[in-house]
Amino acid sequence: MSDCLGGYDFYDEAHEQMVDEPRFVDRGKVTADTFANAGARVLEINSKTGLYPLYVTYSIFRSRCATCYEEELDDAKLQQLWDAAVGENVFVICKTPMAKQITRRTLAGFRKIQVNAHYFEDLINMMKNKPRQFVDRVLKPRYWNQEGVKTMKFDAVVGNPPYQVMDGGSKASATPVYNYFVEQAKELKPAYVSMIIPARWYSGGRGLDAFRESMLHDHRIRQLFDYSDSNDCFAGVDIAGGICYFLWDENHNGSCEVVNFHNGARYETLRQLDDNKVFVRYGQALSILNKVQQQTTEFYDSKVSSQKPFGLRTYVVPTEDGDIQLRYNKGIGPFKRELVTGALDWIDKWKVIMSYLTYDHAGRADKDGKRRIFSTMEVLPPKVVCTETYIVVDSFDSEIEANNLLQYLKTKFVRFLVAQVTTTQHISKANFTLVPIQDFSKAWTDAELYKKYGLTDEEIAFIESMIKPMG
C-alpha cells in the first residue's frame, strides 16, 4: 500500500526486513489527502484479518499525533487519538462475520469502541448482480452510524478482493470476481482507489474482456505495479499470470507509470495503457514491437484456429477403424472422416499444431527468470486431425513449409512476442496478435529474425534473458 498511497511502512525499502521504527513514505498529494489527513475516510473492501485497516489506522493515528505537542502525548491521549482514527477515519466491509470479528479485534482488542465494520451476507453476489444496491448502502451515513454527516465521501478505497469463485462446471474451473470489486470501488466515487488483483486481466477472456477494455482506456489509472511472478509479491503463492496493484486517481487524466518487477529487477515506463491494440506488459518490449509492426502487414492471429479446430472435444477418442487418424491426448489412432465437423479443408493438408496449455507452471519463469511458453508442438501430415487438446497454428500444401513454421515457433523471437500477451495458462489465437507471418519456403533462425527487424544488442539481450532455448 505504501507504493501507491504512502503512509507508515513497517518494512525496509526493499520490503525484505521489518524495521524497528516504521518509516514514513510520502507520495505527495495522495498521501496528504489520505494518510496524512486527520479528516480522511478510507474504506477497505473485503477485509479478512484487519491488516489493511491496521495500516490505515496507524498511519492516520501518527498524523493525529503530529498535531499535538509531545508533552501532551501521554497514554490516555494516545489511546484517545487511536480510538478517534478507528472511529472516524477507517471503514471496513467484510465477507463473513468471522472476518468482521477478527478485524474488530485487530483494531480495538477487547475494548468496546466504535469500529466501522460491516459484513455482507453475500458480498460477491451483490457486487456482481446488485451493484447499485451495494453502492447506495455503503454511501449512506446512517449505515455507518455517522451522526451529523450528510454524505459519505471516501477519500480512498483499498483492498485485496476475492479473486475467483468455482463456476460449477464439470471440471474444477473458476470464474474471476475481482473485476466486480474494482468496478464498484470506482462507482463509490472516491478520490483514490488502490487494489491488488491478479494480472491475467491484461489478456481478457473468461469474462474479463469488458473489464480489460475499461481498465486500459481509463486514463485515471496513475500507477500500475506489475509482478510477472506472484511469488515476488506473495511468497509461496502461485497465481497464474502474476499479480498487480494500481493507483486510480479521480483527478488524473494522462499517462500511467508502469513498474515491472521481473527476475529481481525493477523497470519503469511512462505510457498510455491503450497505446497498442494489446496491452504490452514489459516496457522494455515496446521498442521491439514497434520495429516488428513497422515491417508487418499480417499477423498470426489471423491464421491460428479457434478452440476445437475440427469440432472434436477433448473426450473424443479414436474409432475402431477409419479412413483418417486422430491425434488426441493419449496418442494417435484411426478415425472416421465423417465425424469431423470443422475445418474440413485442413484434413488433407500439412498442419502445425500445439497444446492449448502453456508449458510454464502458473505462467512462472524458471529460477533464471526464463520461460519456455509453448509445450507440445508437432507437424500433422495429411489425413490426421486433432481434438481440442490442440490448436492449429497454420496449414500448408507442403511438408517443408510446415516444418519451417514449426522451427519458427521454436525461436526465442516468436515465443518472446507471444509471452507479451500471455498471462494465463491457455494459448489461443489472441496470443499470436504480435507474431508476424513469414515466408516459410525457407527456415528462420533467431539471428535472421533479429537482423530482419533491426534489433539492437540491448533488445536482443532482453529477449535472451526472458526466453529459454527450445530444441
Question: Language-model segments: which ranges?
Answer:
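A structural signal for short hydrophobic/aromatic patches embedded in well-ordered alpha helices
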Residues: 1, 103, 405, 463-464
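SAM-dependent methyltransferase catalytic region
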Residues: 1-223, 229-233, 242, 246, ...
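C-terminal substrate-recognition regions of SAM-dependent nucleic acid methyltransferases
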Residues: 152, 230-457
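Charged interaction patches that mediate protein-protein contacts
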Residues: 215, 455-460
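Short, amphipathic C-terminal "tail helix"
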Residues: 461-471
